[in-house]
UniProtKB/Swiss-Prot annotation:
Similarity annotation: Belongs to the Casparian strip membrane proteins (CASP) family.
Protein name: CASP-like protein 2U11
Region entry Disordered, spans: 1-22
Matching NCBIfam families: A_tha_TIGR01569
Length: 221
């Protein structure tokens, strides 16, 4: 009777030993993989943000005036602050950077102290939802920047929007690199979301298995 109780307590209950060990090993592997992925994601987003924020070029833009044989050239400096959509792009990257740094510190702290939150499904749910939001934020920011870049490259003759990349070639090149890196970061972020989802539902599987083992031991007693 006593040995059965010990076995049952070891497989299920408030602090199951065997289950904790299995979940703890999985938790450690999960934390290491997620730290590496988040670090890579952080580098990508920082590079994308730095490229856009520091991107500057001064050039001459032709302004046609009716009655004049030639357009008047005006000196302008191309920068992201001039376009509201690009401000959203930069702000979105900043939010993702802040979130990723906080999450990295949290995971590094858990690994360093050998802490665990495997029994707290609410934390796993919050992480999964927040990761998903960051992924969609990156994707939406990159989509907005792509549309603006297309208009800058091709113009919109129907509404008399002129091409600007012919006057700001360097700016548009750096701009394009930033957006491409942002799309890559979005893909990496969705890989992180996939790992978070796997970890979350793995917790349910392990706990359900522990419950079945407890019921089996109870039936044998």
């Amino acid at each position: 009777m006593d040995s059965s109780s010990k076995a049952m307590n070891g497989s299920a209950g408030g602090s199951p030993v065997g289950d904790d060990r299995k979940m703890g090993d999985h938790e450690h592997e999960f934390r290491i993989s997620i730290i590496l992925l988040r670090s890579f994601l952080l580098v990508l987003v920082i590079i994308s943000e730095a490229l856009m924020v520091t991107d500057r070029e001064t050039g001459s833009v032709p302004l046609p005036f009716f009655g004049l044989p030639r357009p008047v050239f005006v000196t302008k400096t191309a920068k992201y602050e001039l376009v509201t959509g690009l401000k959203f792009y930069v702000d979105a990257l900043g939010v993702v950077i802040g979130y990723t740094v906080l999450h990295l510190l949290f995971n590094i702290g858990l690994v360093a102290t050998k802490g665990t939150v495997v029994d707290c499904k609410s934390v796993a749910w919050i992480s999964f939802i927040a990761d998903s939001m960051m992924g969609y934020l990156l994707l939406s920011g990159a989509a907005v920047a792509t549309e603006i870049g297309y208009l800058a490259e091709e113009g919109a003759p129907a509404v008399l929007w002129r091409k600007v990349c012919n006057a700001f070639g360097y700016f548009c090149t750096v701009y394009a690199i930033s957006v491409v890196i942002c799309f890559i970061a979005a893909l990496v972020s969705f890989v992180v979301v996939g790992i978070s989802a796997y970890h979350l539902f793995r917790l349910y599987g392990i706990q359900q298995q522990a419950a079945r083992e407890k019921e089996k031991l109870s039936a044998e007693m």
